[in-house]
From Swiss-Prot:
Function: Amphipathic peptide that displays potent antimicrobial activities against a range of Gram-positive and Gram-negative planktonic bacteria with MIC values in the range 5 uM to 10 uM. In more details, it is active on Listeria ivanovii (MIC=5 uM), Staphylococcus epidermidis (MIC=10 uM), Salmonella enterica (MIC=5 uM), Pseudomonas aeruginosa (ATCC 27853) (MIC=5 uM), Acinetobacter baumannii (MIC=5 uM), Klebsiella pneumoniae (MIC=5 uM), Escherichia coli (MIC=7.5 uM), Salmonella typhimurium (MIC=7.5 uM), Pseudomonas aeruginosa (ATCC 9027) (MIC=10 uM).
Keyword Membrane: yes
Protein name: Mauriporin
Primary residence: secreted
Lineage of source species: Eukaryota, Metazoa, Ecdysozoa, Arthropoda, Chelicerata
GO cellular component: extracellular region; membrane; other organism cell membrane
Natural source organism: Androctonus mauritanicus (Fat-tailed scorpion)
Keyword Signal: yes
């Protein structure tokens, strides 16, 4: 191989190593927290919590958890 090819391989390898070494769990968790799916789940959770709080405050009858019907596969 000529020197230019070796130099390109070296730089690419260094970039890959830099990316692997910079990977941190905190950054990964931060990306998950900001994802669209997480935002939808948090919004749904807040909505359910508000509904539950309103039922408790207003003294509404507690609903029993319905037993799920057969699950489709």
């Amino acid at each position: 191989m000529n020197k230019k090819t070796l130099l390109v391989i070296f730089f690419i390898t260094m970039l890959i190593v830099d990316e692997v070494n910079s990977f941190k769990i905190g950054g990964f968790i931060k990306k998950l927290w900001r994802s669209k799916l997480a935002k939808k789940l948090r919004a749904k959770g807040r909505e359910l919590l508000k509904d539950y709080a309103n039922r408790v405050i207003n003294g509404g009858p507690e609903e029993e958890a319905a037993v799920p019907a057969e699950r489709r596969r």
